[in-house]
Amino acid sequence: MKSYDVVIIGGGPGGYNAAIRAGQLGLTVACVEGRSTLGGTCLNVGCMPSKALLHASELYEAASGDEFAHLGIEVKPTLNLAQMMKQKDESVTGLTKGIEYLFRKNKVDWIKGWGRLDGVGKVVVKAEDGSETALQAKDIVIATGSEPTPLPGVTIDNQRIIDSTGALSLPQVPKHLVVIGAGVIGLELGSVWRRLGSQVTVIEYLDRICPGTDTETAKTLQKALAKQGMVFKLGSKVTQATASADGVSLVLEPAAGGTAESLQADYVLVAIGRRPYTKGLNLESVGLETDKRGMLAQRTPPTSVPGVWVIGDVTSGPMLAHKAEDEAVACIERIAGKPHEVNYNLIPGVIYTRPELATVGKTEEQLKAEGRAYKVGKFPFTANSRAKINHETEGFAKVIADAETDEVLGVHLVGPSVSEMIGEFCVAMEFSASAEDIALTCHPHPTRSEALRQAAMNVDGMAMQI
């Protein structure tokens, strides 16, 4: 039985980053992963391939519509979907090979197979051929990620009724794509196929899109997506979906009750969220339990069992790759005897549509519920010079600060390239910056980031460019 300082079950963003940091700190480490490639859902069938398609589809729509023509670029593009998928796959392959290189560089053993616990300090790995290998470790990190949440009454066959993985590799552009769920996954993948020519209808049980985000930014995003042609049926639920060789027949009902309606689609994407993947881990062998969703109840990263840690989507908090990465670093450094904590109040979230939505910290709704006094500064991209000359003026920046101390409590952005701007406020808020600190900090001109400074100025009504 081979022995390690740390054995990590799962090779996604949490698992592979934990393995790399363990190697950097001089720990002997093995990462158990049953996929043929490292990177987990995010790299293989999630974050990265979806961004590749979002980028390509955005350029295609710009070239085939009025956007390029308005700039004096007159072209008539032809969609080569097979090539678009090929470049997406090539990008993903390059990234997975990069992780393999980092494993070799940091002396991480990749044990190929599916891991399960076998009591404290032991992991059994089952390879594809059925053979099993036992590993021993001082510390075990569970980083098995998540899987798409199924919808009762709707059977995902990945032929006509698909999950997010299926939506990344459709063989043709659907005439009509129905998306069940108006969260990150549904809106991003719905945007891809709408840009490529699909009619897209989004069905959401709640009366709003982007649950959990700032209401005002979500409404602005919905308005922008609707203007682009995306159809929303909010406050609705799918009670039946029947697939055939050439499409899907759906039955919808109002969430609050009422008259049902029928809907036809070429494909249906079920994107109602994700749930922790803890099947087959044999958690009971170490005395760990999960809740109804399969989530490990213990707060991350240490569990109630000495020597067993849990990070990423299998535990509480947002199911985001960067949250898993932060937990990975904190977990391994604590194993190595170094103090390290994750600031769960400052985990940013992004929706990579056009316009983009980005958020960090508290929303107005949360602060009202807490009874905390606050002030708000907003600045529209219509008043930002770079946004105007680039003809991307939808959206705004919103900064929320404490009414007395002026400390920034939350930042909510909807607009062009805001995914690349939210990090500024993550840093600022980590150091308890005030809105005035941001307002007094020079920003380059002309950039979209100036909208952030102007919003911070406007917390006290002092924006200069509106």
Swiss-Prot record:
EC number, as in UniProt: 1.8.1.4
InterPro entries: Class-I_Pyr_Nuc-Dis_Oxidored, FAD/NAD-bd_sf, FAD/NAD-binding_dom, FAD/NAD-linked_Rdtase_dimer_sf, Lipoamide_DH, Pyr_nuc-diS_OxRdtase, Pyr_nucl-diS_OxRdtase_dimer, Pyr_OxRdtase_I_AS
Disulfide bonds: C42-C47
GO biological process: 2-oxoglutarate metabolic process
Record's subcellular location: Cytoplasm
Keywords (A to Z) from UniProt: Cytoplasm, Disulfide bond, FAD, Flavoprotein, NAD, Oxidoreductase, Redox-active center
Substrates-to-products reaction catalysed: N(6)-[(R)-dihydrolipoyl]-L-lysyl-[protein] + NAD(+) = N(6)-[(R)-lipoyl]-L-lysyl-[protein] + NADH + H(+)
Binding site for NAD(+): G181, A182, G183, V184, I185, E204, V238, A271, I272, G273, R274
Cofactor binding: number and manner: Binds 1 FAD per subunit.
Cofactors that this protein relies on: FAD
Single GO molecular function: flavin adenine dinucleotide binding
Annotated family: Belongs to the class-I pyridine nucleotide-disulfide oxidoreductase family.
Function noted in UniProt: LPD-3 may substitute for lipoamide dehydrogenase of the 2-oxoglutarate dehydrogenase and pyruvate multienzyme complexes when the latter is inactive or missing.
Record's miscellaneous remark: The active site is a redox-active disulfide bond.
Official protein name in the record: Dihydrolipoyl dehydrogenase 3
Originating species: Pseudomonas putida (Arthrobacter siderocapsulatus)
